């Protein structure tokens, strides 16, 4: 017993599995779009895939450069339909030629020949031949013959631009023609309509089967020329595609400067295509380039909405903690396939294929071949902003995101965006905080064994990335290249403003911001801007209280890795900073700077009772306690009528006066001078005044962040202790200004004036809100006299 519909139903089921991403063992990634498929179907339809999969290669680099063409070819493999139009014929032809699918190649050539413009508008297709008309007439004759056979097989005599062509299929399909009739009417459009290519039945069973397929397909899909704005539109490719086993996502494209290849990721963005409908019963897990549907998937946990089932599934794993993707080498689990693939690549960090022209090495021979196009002149896509050349238009488009500032690749975990998929993949690894792989040489830890292997290169005596001058090891060729400039003295990057030269382009970029005043890295909490991202990161951690760097020996935490490294030197008693005068060594340069004061004779810390100077603040405090019995320098302050008394002693003036500087979005707390004198003691009054002012501000606005401000450079801190530690870099300026009238007034500069009758005794201070005394000048309102101080970069 025969079942005529069986083969059709099997193919339909395979197509549904492909559209839903079920049981697919192969995935293409072209221009950021995933194409899922079955190896068996690919091998049955393409001689190229048949030979490819016989070799059992898991990851193969293909020279396929457009998503639109690949989508049409895959659609043909599973549905026996090929929607050709003048807009997509070049894309389809390029893919079909590469995959050795001769039937599609012939159909594309036929359509292109029919699409050539006629010499006379009103003439029929037979009489409107252009140059090379003999060939075209031959093609049209062949098309007419095929149409006649198709009409006989189907029992149909339908004509017109919308007819569907069928081709005979015996293992491999025969060539097919376009859907335009040879005897087209004069008033019909000259541009041939889209063509649907179907198999021709060769038996009665096949005829019935094809008839049913034809009827269902006519109801299912309306054939139209590709329109702009849809996902299926013609688009320049982004570079070679990658075929691999399911769950492994590799992007196409040219290898970046420091990495052997770019790995594709899912952007995590909801690319809504409003008003466009998916074919009934499909969900599109970022599949081929068709219009996405209006199906909305809403997360019940957080309310986030998605139009792609695949992105929705990946997002759900954030809440469930599911990690279905595992490394084939070490079995480590991941929730995102892109992160898994990035991890797997670290198991084989060697790059055996080297470029003879420049020496750059790659992991895959296909990537080396792509790179060689730069030297051969095939890299014809040039960036208009920086002049850099690319071998594919897709790579150029991704590169231009750097100049435009667009960041289309978003992390599903934290929402952070990236301009390229490789950066996103590296970022995904940071969400895996388990660092169980420890370096036996330096105790450094890694969350992946591949990263540990790459790190071990620096300990190998004869590693592949070793500096021949000093023997230092590196994990990437780019880092070694930059390091070699230290020995050669090469500084190829020149500032156009001051002609200063730099060995690294990033250093030049940061330097130029000094001239332009650009501070692109802005804190979203307080609005402060920085010239570089590392300074902003350190600053934001002051707001959040985050201290991610922990000392394993004592448990102390730090904001920056450089602070932790400096702290570890104390444990190891490493003192790299030596005094040039006495050779005494110090852990950090700050301690050395304080020590040098001994040799220079500078005494910035003054007693305002007797005027004696000291080179250290603790010596000043000791002097006050012993010589003046701890009472010297107490300032007797007379409050204004109805006000409160606040007292500052010399003993605590050095620290408390700087700690007292505070700022918020609501009010400014600062030190101001007053007129007469009353008796009081103890500095706790000043602390109480600070607490009262802070409490008042927070009562008015509970969301207010109290920031303690440095009067010299304007930097703000979350607590007074941090401010006090920071202020040491200003020593004479920030501290001495409280000691004498002259120094105090100099802080305002020659252009500032004081209200008449306000000559004060030295160091008399009171702590008040800025708006507490109208018209009275404050330190915070004075122009800064010290240069901007940025937090140290990591």
UniProtKB/Swiss-Prot annotation:
Residues 260-299, 628-709 are annotated as: Interaction with MYC. Residues 116-285, 769-794 are annotated as: Disordered. Found in all the embryonic and adult tissues examined. The keyword Chloroplast does not apply. One of its GO terms (biological process) is positive regulation of DNA-templated transcription. Residues 1-104 form the BTB domain. Residues 628-794 are annotated as: Interaction with HCFC1. Disulfide bonds: none annotated. It is found in: Nucleus. Coiled coil: none annotated. Undergoes 'Lys-48'-linked polyubiquitination at Lys-388 and Lys-472 and subsequent proteasomal degradation in a TRAF2-dependent manner and upon TNFA stimulation. InterPro entries: BTB/POZ_dom (IPR000210), SKP1/BTB/POZ_sf (IPR011333), Znf_C2H2_sf (IPR036236), Znf_C2H2_type (IPR013087). Residues 203-216 have a biased composition (Low complexity). There is a cross-link at residues 388, 472 (Glycyl lysine isopeptide (Lys-Gly) (interchain with G-Cter in ubiquitin)). SMART domains: BTB, ZnF_C2H2. CDD domains: BTB_POZ_ZBTB17_MIZ1. Residues 784-794 have a biased composition (Pro residues). GO terms for cellular component: nucleus; protein-DNA complex. Residues 132-142, 243-252 have a biased composition (Basic and acidic residues). Residues 254-263 have a biased composition (Acidic residues). Transcription factor that can function as an activator or repressor depending on its binding partners, and by targeting negative regulators of cell cycle progression. Has been shown to bind to the promoters of adenovirus major late protein and cyclin D1 and activate transcription. Required for early embryonic development during gastrulation. Plays a critical role in early lymphocyte development, where it is essential to prevent apoptosis in lymphoid precursors, allowing them to survive in response to IL7 and undergo proper lineage commitment. Homooligomerizes (via the BTB/POZ domain), multimerization is required for DNA binding. Binds to the C-terminal helix-loop-helix motif of MYC which inhibits ZBTB17 transactivation and growth arrest activities and renders it insoluble in the nucleus. Also interacts with HCFC1, MAGEA4 and TMPRSS11A. Interacts (via the C-terminal zinc fingers) with GFI1; the interaction results in the recruitment of MYC to the CDKN1A/p21 and CDKN1B promoters and repression of transcription. Interacts with TRAF2, interfering with the binding of UBC13 to TRAF2, and inhibiting TRAF2 E3 ligase activity. This is Zinc finger and BTB domain-containing protein 17. It comes from Mus musculus.
């Amino acid at each position: 017993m025969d079942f005529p519909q069986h083969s059709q139903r099997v193919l339909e089921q395979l197509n549904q599995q492909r559209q839903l991403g079920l049981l697919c063992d192969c995935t293409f990634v072209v221009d950021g779009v995933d194409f899922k498929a079955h190896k068996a179907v690919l091998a049955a339809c393409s001689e190229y895939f048949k030979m490819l999969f016989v070799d059992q290669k898991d990851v193969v680099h293909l020279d396929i450069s457009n998503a639109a063409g690949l989508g049409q070819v895959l659609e043909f493999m599973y549905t026996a339909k090929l929607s050709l139009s003048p807009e997509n014929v070049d894309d389809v032809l390029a893919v079909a030629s590469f995959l050795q699918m001769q039937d599609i190649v012939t159909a594309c050539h036929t359509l292109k020949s029919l699409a050539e413009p006629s010499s006379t508008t009103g003439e029929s297709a037979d009489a409107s031949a252009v140059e090379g008309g003999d060939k075209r007439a031959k093609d049209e004759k062949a098309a007419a013959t095929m149409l006649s056979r198709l009409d006989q097989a189907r029992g149909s005599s339908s004509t017109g631009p919308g007819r569907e062509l069928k081709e005979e299929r015996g293992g491999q399909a025969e060539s097919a023609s376009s859907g335009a009739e040879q005897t087209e009417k004069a008033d019909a459009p000259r541009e041939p309509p889209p063509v649907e290519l179907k198999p021709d039945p060769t038996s009665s069973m096949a005829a019935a089967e094809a008839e049913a397929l034809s009827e269902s397909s006519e109801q299912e899909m309306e054939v139209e020329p590709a329109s702009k704005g849809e996902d299926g539109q013609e688009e320049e490719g982004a570079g070679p595609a990658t075929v691999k086993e399911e769950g492994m996502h590799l992007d196409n494209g040219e290898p970046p400067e420091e990495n052997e290849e770019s790995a594709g990721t899912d952007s995590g963005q909801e690319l809504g295509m409003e008003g466009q409908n998916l074919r009934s019963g499909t969900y599109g897990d970022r599949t081929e380039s068709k219009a996405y549907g209006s199906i909305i998937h809403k997360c019940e946990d957080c309310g986030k909405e998605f139009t792609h089932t695949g992105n929705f599934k990946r997002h759900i794993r954030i809440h469930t903690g599911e990690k279905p993707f595992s490394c084939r080498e070490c079995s480590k689990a991941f929730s995102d396939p892109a992160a898994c693939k990035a991890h797997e690549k670290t198991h084989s960090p060697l790059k055996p294929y080297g470029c003879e022209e420049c020496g750059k090495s790659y992991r895959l021979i296909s990537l080396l071949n792509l790179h060689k196009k730069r030297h051969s002149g095939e890299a014809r896509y040039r960036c208009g902003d920086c002049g850099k050349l690319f071998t594919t238009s897709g790579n150029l488009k991704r590169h231009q995101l750097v100049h435009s500032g667009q960041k289309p690749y978003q992390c599903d975990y934290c929402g952070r965006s990236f301009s390229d998929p490789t950066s996103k993949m590296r970022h995904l690894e940071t969400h895996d905080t388990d660092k169980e792989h420890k370096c036996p040489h330096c105790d450094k830890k890694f969350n992946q064994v591949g990263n540990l292997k790459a790190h071990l290169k620096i300990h190998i005596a004869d590693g592949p990335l070793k500096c021949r001058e000093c023997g230092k090891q590196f994990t990437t060729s780019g880092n070694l290249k930059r390091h070699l400039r230290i020995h050669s003295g090469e500084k190829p990057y020149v500032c156009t403003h001051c002609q200063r030269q730099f060995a690294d382009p990033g250093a030049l970029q940061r330097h130029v911001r000094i001239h332009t005043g650009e501070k692109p890295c802005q804190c979203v909490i307080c609005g402060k801007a920085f010239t570089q991202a590392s300074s902003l990161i350190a600053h934001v951690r002051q707001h959040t209280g985050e201290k991610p760097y922990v000392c394993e020996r004592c448990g102390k935490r730090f904001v920056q890795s450089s602070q932790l490294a400096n702290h570890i030197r104390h444990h190891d008693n490493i003192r790299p900073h030596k005094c040039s005068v006495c050779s005494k060594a110090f852990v950090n340069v700050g301690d050395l700077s304080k020590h040098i004061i001994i040799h220079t004779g500078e005494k910035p810390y003054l007693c305002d009772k007797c005027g004696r100077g000291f080179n250290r603040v603790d010596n000043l405090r000791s002097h006050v306690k012993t010589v003046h019995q701890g009472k010297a320098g107490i300032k007797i302050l007379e409050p204004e009528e109805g006000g409160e008394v606040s007292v500052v002693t010399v003993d605590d003036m050095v620290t408390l006066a700087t700690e007292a500087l505070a700022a918020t979005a609501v009010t400014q707390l600062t030190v101001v001078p007053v007129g007469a004198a009353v008796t009081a003691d103890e500095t706790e009054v000043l602390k109480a005044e600070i607490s009262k002012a802070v409490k008042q501000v927070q009562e008015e606005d509970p969301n207010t962040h109290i920031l303690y401000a440095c009067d010299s450079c304007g930097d703000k801190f979350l607590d007074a202790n941090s401010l006090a530690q920071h202020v040491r870099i200003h020593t004479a300026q920030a501290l001495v200004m409280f000691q004498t009238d002259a120094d105090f007034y100099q802080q305002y500069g020659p252009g500032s004036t004081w209200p008449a009758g306000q000559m004060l005794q030295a160091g008399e201070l009171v702590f008040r809100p800025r708006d507490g005394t109208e018209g009275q000048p404050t330190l915070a309102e004075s122009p800064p006299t010290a240069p901007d101080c940025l937090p140290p970069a990591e």
